[in-house]
Amino acid sequence: MKNKVVVIPGSFSLVSAYGGYDGIDIWLNKKLDKEKLKGADFIIAHSAGVNYLFTQPILNNQKIILINPLVKKINLISLLIRDVRFFIAEGIDRNKIIPLSSWIFASIKVLRLLKINVLENLRKLPKENVVIIRGTKDYYFCDSENANLIKNEGFILYEVDAGHNWNKNIAEVVNTLIHAN
């Protein structure tokens, strides 16, 4: 039986950037098909997409794969500084981000979602249903301090050769996790 997988992309990213998985383009200013989440066996959420996930109902039988989550709450100034450093270091692939026409909508959504306490919500989930993947070169959002918080809470953490963005190394771990079930 094939697992149904749904992706919730990171800030300003499109689902199409995630290797062909189905998903919800939460950063576009359009109606969302939230029903996709209810029927998913696996939910992959990346970065601020994790914050969005925690605004939705999660079923006890769903497997959750979190990629570079923003575990530790940060203030707006810190976020902006990290954003600038991130964009300088990792760049922007224009084919993977939302159109400029959705940027104001996405910016407002990010600010709202940053109020979500990711760590508090993680604690509510069954640990056996959650896997977290961190890029070891993510110095901006899911840094070593966030990794230590994740480990101290007892969650499974895979650390791979990646930055903050989805890449082939993250994709390989995700693929292995999905096909192992």
Predicted segments, located by residue:
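Short, surface-exposed "cap/lid" segments of acyl-processing enzymes
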Residues: M1-L32
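The conserved beta1-alpha1 loop
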Residues: V6-G10, H46, R134-G135
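Residue in the alpha/beta-hydrolase core beta-strand immediately N-terminal to the catalytic nucleophile
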Residues: D41-I44, K63-I65
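Hydrophobic/aromatic beta-strand patches that form the interior of the parallel beta-sheet core
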Residues: V6, D22-I24, I65, V131-I133, ...
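Gly/Ala-rich beta-loop-alpha elbow adjacent to hydrolase catalytic centers
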Residues: I44-L53
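Aromatic pocket-lining residues of Rossmann-like dinucleotide-binding sites
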Residues: Q56-L59
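Post-His helix in hydrolase/transferase enzymes
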Residues: N167-A180
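The alpha/beta-hydrolase serine catalytic core
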Residues: P69-F141, A147, E153-I170
